[in-house]
Amino acid sequence: GSCLELGEYCNGSKDDCQCCRDNAYCGCDIF
């Protein structure tokens, strides 16, 4: 998946979560 925009939350995609976490783009719940 692609990186999420600033302020957006992941929709359950682990790729988006990983990208989100690594790039500090948003407050993603890591599971």
Swiss-Prot record:
InterPro entries: Toxin_34
A Pfam family hit: Toxin_34
Keyword Nucleotide-binding annotated: no
Subcellular location: Secreted
Signal peptide, first to last residue: none
Major location category of this protein: secreted
Record key words, sorted: Secreted
GO cellular component: extracellular region
Organs and tissues of expression: Expressed by the venom gland.
GO molecular function terms listed in the Swiss-Prot or TrEMBL record: toxin activity
Cystine crosslinks: none
Function: Not toxic to mice by intracerebroventricular injection.
Family in the record: Belongs to the neurotoxin 04 (omega-agtx) family. 03 (type II/III omega-agtx) subfamily.
Protein's recorded name: U14-ctenitoxin-Co1c
Naturally occurring in which organism (per UniProt): Ctenus ornatus (Brazilian spider)
